[in-house]
Amino acid sequence: MLVTTTERISGQEYEIIGEVFGLTTRSKNMFKDLGAGLKSVVGGEIKGYTDMQREARDQAIERLKAEASKLGADAVVMMRFDSGTIGTDMQSVVAYGTAVKYI
């Protein structure tokens, strides 16, 4: 399924089905947290958190596609991300967009 951040799909006519969302929430690994604490002192990328964020983003997109597919969509346009923290040790990522059906 095509997922795009653009409003239009070049050369394609479609009708709008509606909004779709894909959400995931991840918790930090307490052992990786120890390494992250040290990195925050000396500086540098915290690879464990970067990987967690990438995996969360990918899962949110897959869930977005699954929801769109259930609605009979052929694509999702205007896809966006939002993220936030829940408490001190959880990260939530949502992918959202507009499900469309080709005509």
Swiss-Prot record:
Pfam family, one: YbjQ_1
Family (UniProt): Belongs to the UPF0145 family.
PANTHER family for this protein: UPF0145 PROTEIN SCO3412, UPF0145 PROTEIN YBJQ
Protein name: UPF0145 protein EF_0241
Source organism: Enterococcus faecalis (strain ATCC 700802 / V583)
